[in-house]
Amino acid sequence: MNAQEIIEYIRTSEKKTPVKVYVWEKTPVTFPNCREFPAGEGCKIVFGDWKDVKPVLENNEFSHLEIENDCRNSAIPLLDMKDIPARIEPGAILREQVEIGKNAVIMMGAVINIGAIVGEGTMIDMGAVLGG
């Protein structure tokens, strides 16, 4: 991606605030536009965007509630690393729209931002920051 394509991608991306919510319901509740996973009687784990989850939480009562969230109005999600043919250590941060070459090594604490290209067999050391 060139600089203009990156700017346009960020500008037009839907901004999201993903949350994971653990709830113990007093009465059954549905979370529209969210993924719900039962976790026992009256308990569930909910994945969704804050704009969809917040109204449900405000308009219902729960016995217990815990919310996890790690970003706000984020334009670029993290890279799905499951099928990347490289070694990526815990704590490395890779955004979508990066290219990671075969057998590359990304050490913990490295940050690989949108548009960056890491060549085949390349090692990115701890604390390195690469951008496109």
Predicted region positions:
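Terminal amphipathic alpha-helical/low-complexity segments used for targeting or macromolecular assembly
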Residues: 1-83
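Structural signal for interior beta-strand "rungs" in well-ordered beta-sheet cores
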Residues: 82, 86-132
